[in-house]
Amino acid sequence: MLAVNEYFEGQVKSISFDGAEKPASVGVMEVGDYEFGTAAPEVMQVISGALTVMLPGQTEWQTFNAGEQFDVIGNAKFQVKVETQTAYLCIYG
């Protein structure tokens, strides 16, 4: 079943769905700075645009462009900077 989600006053929108192997969501982030929290481990794949990310336990920002992905541990917070509208796929678990 599809579920539409909206965060940060509409600046981030996603659609959750049952992926082939794990739950997932696909969405778009508007230009801005965000902090997300995870309940379970996540794999974030950048579809279009770029995400500059401060991952848990890291001290330097990393930029991930279209076609690249990064892992986020569960039960953690991470920061994201978006300089152009960016589409992503997030796989949970």
UniProtKB/Swiss-Prot annotation:
UniProt EC number: 2.4.2.1, 2.4.2.2
Keyword Glycoprotein in annotation: no
Record-linked Pfam families: Ppnp
Gene3D superfamilies cross-referenced by the UniProt entry: Jelly Rolls
Catalytic activity: a purine D-ribonucleoside + phosphate = a purine nucleobase + alpha-D-ribose 1-phosphate; adenosine + phosphate = alpha-D-ribose 1-phosphate + adenine; cytidine + phosphate = cytosine + alpha-D-ribose 1-phosphate; guanosine + phosphate = alpha-D-ribose 1-phosphate + guanine
Record flagged with keyword Glycosyltransferase: yes
CC per GO annotation: cytosol
Top enzyme category: transferase
GO molecular function per UniProt: guanosine phosphorylase activity; purine-nucleoside phosphorylase activity; thymidine phosphorylase activity; uridine phosphorylase activity
Key words of the record: Glycosyltransferase, Transferase
SUPFAM superfamilies in the record: RmlC-like cupins
Entry superkingdom: Bacteria
Job description of the protein: Catalyzes the phosphorolysis of diverse nucleosides, yielding D-ribose 1-phosphate and the respective free bases. Can use uridine, adenosine, guanosine, cytidine, thymidine, inosine and xanthosine as substrates. Also catalyzes the reverse reactions.
Listed PANTHER family: PYRIMIDINE/PURINE NUCLEOSIDE PHOSPHORYLASE, PYRIMIDINE_PURINE NUCLEOSIDE PHOSPHORYLASE
Family of this protein: Belongs to the nucleoside phosphorylase PpnP family.
UniProt name for this protein: Pyrimidine/purine nucleoside phosphorylase
